[in-house]
Amino acid sequence: MRFELTFRNLEASDAIKAYAQDKLAKLDKYLRPPAEAHVAFSMERRLHCVDVSVHEAGVHYQGRAEEQDMYASIDAVVDKLLRQLHRNRDQNHNHRRGPQADEGPRE
C-alpha cells in the first residue's frame, strides 16, 4: 500500500509516521493492490485528529477519529476502517453465495 502523510497545525514526527504506517499495514490483507492511503494528522482545539482515505480498485473507505492522544486517534481510525472492510467483504461474500436452498419439501 502506498501512503501519503500530511501534517496540519503540528510538527511532523518520525515516530507518528512509523506508528501510522505500521497500524495501516493491517489493512493490506483486506485490500487488492494497488491501494493508496491518504492520512492527514491535525490538531483541533485540544484534540488530535486523524483523517484517513483509502482507495482501492474503485472502492473508497474513509475514517476520522478525534482523541486526546495522537496514538489513540490512529488506533481508533484503523478500527473504523477495519469494520468497514469487514462489512464490505461480508456483503460481497453473501451476495456471491446466493440464496440458501430449502432443506426439502415439508410434510
Named regions from a protein language model:
Residues 1-107:
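N-terminal, polar/charged subdomain of small-to-medium soluble alpha/beta proteins
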